[in-house]
């Protein structure tokens, strides 16, 4: 089956554009980093001349490319009119505290920290705010905005995988099921969040404390509980009821987050159990156990 997708990756400096481009490249995309805006239409022309049955491409553009925002509307119009190409725009962002920390850790200069900024005595925070104002028009027209403040590199790659899969050869809804610890914060990109902290906690059994919800002894412990069984049935019914309407509304993917205290036992077990059931029914499922650093794809 034909695979066609063209993605423009942009956003704030330090938000993860390089990671996204690497993730897309690993999925078979032909990627170009920091493509000049004046070459976007020429790049589209090259894509249009390739085999029509296979076209996966992505380009990243940031504020180093200062003429891009002014040129983008006309470039997109030319791509549509001349080559029937409609790129999707993925815009990455993060909060100021996260961006400041990332620049401090990597010791890299911000692209806007030029001689003029130095002459004006601008701080990094001021430069970040100036950049946010510059790229806001692009954020407003993006097909997908992704906040990377509370996700690591591995988690970002998974988000990109889910988003890019959704409009390619797999035409159905992609479901991302993720476990997490409430004590470490809610996943920001959740469509639905379910609290499993009322279920029996294997943590209080010394023999189970070091294990996870993927281990047989923990599964056996939880499956003996009527509360766990009822919760599983309720969640299964909810997902089976609402996934189809989401797909009919042309949603690309849905993120369902299941949390417990430590993100190790109950939420991990429930994600695994629901994923096995739904994948067996033909649903495309991505699993992420945030606190365990585990990701998997089930088909």
Swiss-Prot record:
Protein name as catalogued: Nucleotide-binding protein AFE_3021
Cited SUPFAM superfamilies: P-loop containing nucleoside triphosphate hydrolases
Annotated signal peptide: none
GO MF annotation, one: ATP binding
NCBIfam families, sorted: PRK05416.1 (NF003828)
Keyword GTP-binding: yes
Domain of life: Bacteria
Record function comment: Displays ATPase and GTPase activities.
Family recorded in the similarity comment: Belongs to the RapZ-like family.
Binding of GTP, residues: 62-65
